[in-house]
Amino acid sequence: IEAFWKWWPSLRNDLHTLRITGGEPLMNPGAMQFFDLLEDEPAPHLEITLNSNLGVTFDRVDRLIARVKSLIEQKKIRKFSFFTSIDSWGEQAEYMRTGLKCDHWERNMKEVIKAGATVNLMCTYNVLCVTNFQKLLHKVIEWRKEYGKEAVSFDTPYLKEPPHWMINILPEEFIKHQEDTLKFIEDNMDWFTGVEYEKFKRVTDYMKENPVSDLKILQGRRDFYSFFSENDRRLGTNLLEVFPEYSNFYNLCKNIYENYDNRNK
């Protein structure tokens, strides 16, 4: 941090984009200190992007937004955009990201949009997204209807490691869920962009082609049961209560795990 403050005077006039990430920047006093500095030392050509999980208190978000809104209105910065992670909606999303509360997250996200910032959703598309991702897409449409199509964007990179989170370990019958979600985007192109469609189609094609080796799929299925059974035990959660449609797959993974365990005793 000290090195940055010393560097900033020479950096300020030539820097066009600054991304503040973490950790959680809104828990770091240095982030607000930087926005305070911009009040006295404007950078009207500067675009600032900030990463946050939006799980912090309302007060922290409100203080940031008030400062950012002031900087934009006074043209002391050029633009502010926001990146945050979410992979579905409701109890499924909360299961995937321990500690996430969708109502809390949504309230904070809306305050960011109201300040004039673009919110970019980073969706890490994983094994648990396939049957319920449409829930998030419905919310995206809702937010775009309320705040404008440009207010919220989303990206869908698929997760490749660790194997127990890969979509490729799912049986073929899950492809129907993936195709249904792609069709939902196609049927609602008034609210989605061509880029969003193509990126999700890429995920769908990757799931269908499944270039992953049989050995890695076997490893992923074994680890799926190992990880989520232990995760549920430690956190007091229950995967099959939240994702009942995964019951047959879960039992398949359990059998693989138990057979592997028995062979190695």
Where is each model-derived feature located?
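Conserved RecA-like ASCE ATPase "motif II neighborhood" in helicase/translocase motors
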Residues: I1-W7
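Helix N-terminus capping/helix-initiation residues
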Residues: K101, P171-E172, G236
